[in-house]
Amino acid sequence: MERMNWLSRLASRGPGHRIPQGANLQTPVMADPETCLMVFKNHWSQVVRILERQGPRAAPGGADDLSAVRNHTYQMLTLLAEDRAVPSAPTGPGPLLEFALHEDLLTRVLTWQLQWDELGDGVEERRAEQLKLFEMLVSEARQPLLRHGPVREALLTLLDACGRPVPSSPALDEGLVLLLSQLCVCVAQEPSLLEFFLQPPPEPGAAPRLLLFSRLVPFVHREGTLGQQARDALLLLMALSAGSPTVGRYIADHSYFCPVLATGLSALYSSLPRKIEVPGDDWHCLRREDWLGVPALALFMSSLEFCNAVIQVAHPLVQKQLVDYIHNGFLVPVMGPALHKTSVEEMIASTAYLELFLRSISEPALLRTFLRFLLLHRHDTHTILDTLVARIGSNSRLCMVSLSLFRTLLNLSCEDVLLQLVLRYLVPCNHVMLSQKPAVRDVDLYGRAADKFLSLIPRCCRHHAPSPPRPEHASWARGPGSPSVDSSSVTTVPRPSTPSRLALFLRQQSLGGSESPGPAPCSPGLSASPASSPGRRPTPAEEPGELEDNYLEYLREARRGVDRCVRACRTWSAPYDGERPSPEPSPFGSRTKKRSLLPEEDRNNVGEGEEEELGRRGRAGGAGEGPGHLPPPQLNGVPGSWPEGAKKVRLVPKEGAGELLEGISEGMAGLEGFGQELRELEVALSNGGTGSESPLEPPLPLEEEEAYESFTCPPEPPGPFLSSPLRTLNQLPSQPFTGPFMAVLFAKLENMLQNSVYVNFLLTGLVAQLACHPQPLLRSFLLNTNMVFQPSVKSLLQVLGSVKNKIENFAASQEDFPALLSKAKKYLIARGKLDWAEGPAAGPAPRRSDPLVKSRRPSLGELLLRHAHSPTRARQAAQLVLQPGRDGAGLGLSGGSPGASTPVLLTRGGAPERQGEALRVKNAVYCAVIFPEFLKELAAISQAHAVTSPFLLETSEEGSGPLISGCGPLNP
């Protein structure tokens, strides 16, 4: 009973219930130092009489001795915790501590108690008591006890005893972690103490021991507060190891810390759900509130965040080792096969997990190894990135999750990612006519591209309501260069001194007034209009034009997006302007010869050190090298080798060159290898998009027919999927190729009418992200409407023109198209309003029965927001207060609330034969709403480039944060 009472008193010192250092203990009130010392010595004399007997006695009376020692020890340690240094010697030990150190009190008592372990009875309970007692002493002591060797020796003896095989229990684990956590806090306050806990090897050739560290490692992946407390304590030690080479070498060379972290991630990943149940049509990524509701995923994310923090603060040796173990022990053996599962549900889950991991990582070194895995690791002869690109062509949710993943990758502003996806195909400048190469660097200063994009808005989607009166002083801005004015009906007025590229800004300001450029749920273009007042219901003439007068907000958002990309790309290795890197192929240089000396299998397995050396040599002598000899990609500044298919010379042979290849010297073997790898890549890509094909999908156009054929057809036999003859598999690429990524994006974009509204939101957002990049090669490819491309290369303008024609043809064939278009606009606006508004008055919350996600489902407004890049459409959709329809039946989209998970525009009966037609019409009408907004966004981005690029590309602004070479700011 006495022992239980003692435990109950110690239990109050557990986590969350520890007595503050300034509070009085429940045991005897402190008297003067002389009295305390006398009482302390009296307790010690009682203990010494028991200790001097010949070991513990199992005979009757032995248990009484153990209980007496325990009681006296508790009283002594309570007095010792209250001991203070005398005023005459403030830096020395207090009288009680000095006596305890002289008598070696702690070690002698602990050694005697540990002898009872040999009897095998009550070991677990006694160990928990000892841990609690020492934790109380360390946490409540008013003197720096750890400075004294006898105290450290006693603690190390106890920690060593905790490594003996003892039945584990929650109380024992909690006591051990709590004591270790307190010790780590004390050591963090005095870092010089850390090396005193590093014990020398017990025998020659053995490894040193750091029990303070090794006893915490087994708890690193534990669930709940216990695991979190262990991880916090380990982080303190990691931060201390950064300044201690001895401790850093111990952790890297003599501990299993890094392997435990990496293998723990693998084990935790295997317990994640293999299928994510998401009935909502708009789900495309895992948000924080999603994974917090899944214990297995929450535990994995805690461990991943811990790895991220360790790499951030640990010693460089530990950082490098942990990164290598995560790559070789988690990414390659676990994530690689998981991304290539045969089940579509498993592929969706693994892709969503990968996107979440990339979005959650903040440390450049860890992010670098994830990107190295995506860009360079090969699974079944093709890279992970190629597999993910192919899945964009799927017509299932796999497409949405893949688009979300690439959105996250582009948000990183990593040179290597964009190089592998797009730039390496544009660098040779084979996609443009020879006479057009100098125009790659041209900047559209007069808004001609914006005018062209806005002219593609289908007539059936334009708002013809009377426009508000315009002040006469702004009439000069509506000149022939204005994108929205018919130049044939405008009388040209003398141009003012203001640059014409600012005319559109001035006209928008005169129309809509001025407002702070900060993000807001309402359009600045409508802020001065009474139609946008929250308390006013829009008139019937105004209702269809809710999204018409928002171009100024698109300009502001485009300016922010382009500025962000310019800042992030300022440290890239080349401007990619058609001259640097050089588009002209050159003879094989020394770097190529060095690479060609390696056998093919050795080239695929070049070590990281060799990759760095080859990268340095290539950069030193590659000023005049061609596109096949670009400097190897840098993963956040770390040189690496070119992936297969990108490291060889790319030449475009003329007609009849096939017969000449046999006579080319051995030095040209790289060209054949490149062609063969490209063909293998195209065949392999066909295995990625396993999603179901839409029965409503029309025949595809001629755009990049060689590449897109592989996304949709099995490799054997290559059926006649496209309308033009296919290139045979043994034929070298004889036509310009802009890469599989742009090919699949353009093909998906051209089929906007068949895509769901959610796919189109993600797809247009991804294209807008690419368009914001300042590299002239990419900017001219997407936004230069005057550029003349090769006949086999389809431009973005052609793709958009095709979509425009399809929308107009659909509108002409649909009698009730205006009514459906109005309903679709109202639905999108109301849907965004539901999730932007705060409070219960905003409308009913969307319902969800998904067991994975316990919170509200993502809204269209959040899809439009695109998590950082284009919140424009979301704010426009949220600008109106929900108003019931004129017939009092709400918006009439699906007979329910505007937040229903699957809106249906048509309700022409429930027969199965009607469902396909209803889906086709619904997707087409939503496309007609999204397409004009996308054109406005592209027009605004093209104008933002003209205003932004000349300034930020030449100067660097202070306070923009540290930039990482090769990857830009990872967390802008």
Swiss-Prot record:
Q: Which gene encodes it?
A: FHIP1B
Cellular component terms (Gene Ontology): FHF complex
Segments forming a coiled coil:
none
Q: How does it assemble?
A: Component of the FTS/Hook/FHIP complex (FHF complex), composed of AKTIP/FTS, FHIP1B, and one or more members of the Hook family of proteins HOOK1, HOOK2, and HOOK3. The FHF complex associates with the homotypic vesicular sorting complex (the HOPS complex).
Q: Is Transport among this UniProt entry's keywords? A: yes
The family assignment reads: Belongs to the FHIP family.
**What residue range is the signal peptide?**
none
The record's function comment reads: Component of the FTS/Hook/FHIP complex (FHF complex). The FHF complex may function to promote vesicle trafficking and/or fusion via the homotypic vesicular protein sorting complex (the HOPS complex). FHF complex promotes the distribution of AP-4 complex to the perinuclear area of the cell.
Keywords assigned by UniProt, alphabetized? Phosphoprotein, Protein transport, Transport
Low complexity compositional bias, start-end: 478-501, 523-535
| Region of interest: Disordered | 465-548, 573-644
**Residues found modified as Phosphoserine:** S467, S510, S523, S529, S533, S859, S897
What is the protein named? FHF complex subunit HOOK-interacting protein 1B
List the GO biological process terms: early endosome to late endosome transport; endosome organization; endosome to lysosome transport; lysosome organization; protein localization to perinuclear region of cytoplasm; protein transport
Q: Which InterPro entries match?
A: FHIP, FHIP_C, FHIP_KELAA_motif
Domain of life here? Eukaryota
